[in-house]
Regions:
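Basic, alpha-helical interaction scaffolds
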Residues: 123-191
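Short, charged alpha-helical motifs in flexible N/C-terminal segments and linkers
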Residues: 89-107, 200-268
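Short, conserved micro-motifs composed of acidic
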Residues: 19, 83, 98-131
Length: 329
């Protein structure tokens, strides 16, 4: 009864200055900012996700952003995906929602991926080479270069704006602005797209290198000297630490992810190193070897005994004392 009263009989007005518009009835939606709103939306959308999962496809959703994907081996797999899309359209029609074909897309992943044609309400869904998924550019080849070029461009623009806007010559203040407004751009979700190619690694590092070189009094220092003077790590080192933090969270159950999906524990009896070593899978594909679950294993297994695994804060603190020899910066 309470939910029914919450959803029905609602009205709103618009106020401009001291004037109020006529009262209008709200026929759909809920109050923005309400505590129960997100919970009600999950109840609303979960019905669709349960129905789509019956077609033996993988479904993921974040708010109203729904993704469906399946391995295409023959025409039957394409038909199965199309049936799931038809169910989505029928559900939207039932709930009086409109789906725009132009806001949907098909991404064929892999070198040997066949062209798949999917339609929504008699309109063909466009096939794209890349799509932005929760802020990360995912390409057909799964290469991070497109995303890296995008974030580097935005980060350089933000860094230049900071140097133009701040008249202060306080190095610490300028560096604090960089850490607050620029560094998050090139580090958001880095465990998803962390690069392996030298060109991409240097492209990202160049953002911090250029900014620190333009700080007052630091122009004639080398990049390593500037990092030591400012007491900051390289961006490459920060990405490696972020990988290890995520690895710790997954292994010790601090996130809602099953660890055996990503990692296989190594039950070897070797006394060298720590006791939480992982099994390293052999892979010949360059793209796969750079996935988070593959690239982090060697660094994780090579952590010294001095690292404290008892809690995440202690793990982070002791990780900062570890020297990694395979970094460029």
């Amino acid at each position: 009864m309470w939910l029914q009263n919450f959803l029905t009989g609602r009205t709103h007005q618009t106020k401009v200055g001291c004037d109020l518009s006529d009262v209008a009835e709200l026929l759909s939606g809920i109050v923005q900012g309400s505590g129960i709103g997100p919970c009600m939306f999950l109840i609303y959308i979960n019905e669709l996700l349960i129905e789509l999962s019956k077609y033996n496809i993988t479904v993921r959703a974040f708010a109203d952003d729904v993704k469906m994907y399946v391995q295409i081996l023959d025409d039957l797999d394409v038909q199965r995906l199309q049936l799931a899309v038809d169910v989505l359209c029928q559900w939207a029609t039932t709930w009086q929602l409109s789906i725009s074909v132009n806001k949907c897309c098909v991404l064929n992943v892999g070198k040997s991926a066949c062209d798949v044609s999917i339609s929504i309400n008699n309109g063909v869904v466009p096939v794209v080479e890349a799509v932005r998924d929760l802020g990360v550019q995912i390409t057909k080849s799964l290469s991070p270069s497109v995303h890296i070029n995008d974030v580097v461009s935005r980060a350089n623009q933000r860094a230049a704006a900071i140097l133009r806007a701040f008249v202060s010559r306080d190095v610490r203040l300028l560096m604090r602005a960089f850490i607050t407004y620029v560094r998050p751009i090139v580090e958001y979700n880095s465990s998803i797209w962390s690069p392996s190619s030298v060109g991409d690694i240097e492209s990202i590092e160049r953002v911090q290198r250029r900014f620190t070189k333009r700080l007052p009094g630091l122009k004639n220092m080398s990049y390593d000297q500037r990092l030591k003077f400012l007491d900051i790590p390289s961006l490459e080192l920060r990405r490696l630490r972020a990988d290890l933090y995520w690895c710790y969270k997954i292994i010790f159950g601090l996130v809602a992810v099953q660890s055996d999906v990503f990692f296989t524990k190594n039950f070897c009896t070797s006394t060298r190193g720590h006791q939480y070593k992982l099994y390293k899978h052999q892979t010949s594909a360059c793209v796969r070897s750079n996935f988070f679950a593959e690239r982090v294993v060697n660094e994780w297994n090579n952590l010294p005994k001095s690292v404290d695994f008892s809690t995440l804060p202690r793990f982070k603190r002791t990780i900062k004392q570890v020297r990694f020899s395979n970094l460029r910066f």
